[in-house]
């Protein structure tokens, strides 16, 4: 399936917005991309659509439980198998979600930043077929320049 067919089938749109196509094509070509777009500009589609076209799992780092829940609900309703892992789940639910993901049942998994450093998640990530990593909120990124000497 090509970009336009995937866009129509899963998201119901006939065309992409300005800037989306360039980001999506870059992802599908295997490039690292950075999309800086205003609220409501369709950032989520820029990783959700290629996630459906890539062979492995897409991990989305998102700090907001309500956003994760809304995104997963909308994706599941559109026929995309997605899940989230955050503090709203029990340990058993997290174990099941990671087990299902390992079996290839999910294309997209939303993960709270604090879950990235748990042993259970690290074990999963080391063995999973992860094709894309996305940071959905810029404030999840921390850059350390402690190794630089500035004048």
What residue spans do the PLM features occupy?
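Conserved Walker A/P-loop ATP-binding site and its immediately adjacent core
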Residues: 57-75
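Pre-Walker A (Motif I) flank of P-loop NTPase domains
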Residues: 29-34, 56, 106-107
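Conserved helix/coil segment N-terminal to the catalytic DExD/H
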Residues: 91-132
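Conserved pre-motif I regulatory segment
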Residues: 1-36
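Walker B catalytic acidic pair
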Residues: 137
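Conserved small/polar residues in nucleotide/adenosyl-binding loops
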Residues: 146-151
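Conserved helix-turn-beta segment of the N-terminal RecA-like "Helicase ATP-binding" lobe
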Residues: 69-90, 100
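Walker A/P-loop NTP-binding motif
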Residues: 28, 44-57
């Amino acid at each position: 399936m090509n970009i336009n067919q995937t866009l129509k089938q899963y998201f119901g749109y006939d065309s992409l917005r300005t800037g989306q196509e360039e980001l999506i094509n870059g992802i599908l070509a295997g490039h690292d991309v950075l999309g800086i777009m205003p609220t409501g500009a369709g950032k989520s589609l820029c990783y959700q659509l290629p996630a459906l076209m890539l062979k492995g799992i897409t991990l989305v780092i998102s700090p907001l439980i309500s956003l994760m829940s809304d995104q997963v609900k909308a994706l599941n309703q559109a026929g995309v198998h997605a899940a989230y892992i955050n503090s709203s789940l029990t340990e058993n639910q997290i174990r099941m979600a990671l087990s299902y993901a390992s079996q290839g049942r999910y294309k997209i998994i939303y993960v709270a930043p604090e879950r990235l450093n748990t042993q259970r998640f690290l074990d999963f990530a080391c063995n999973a077929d992860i094709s894309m990593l996305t940071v959905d909120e810029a404030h999840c990124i921390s850059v350390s320049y402690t190794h630089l000497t500035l004048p």
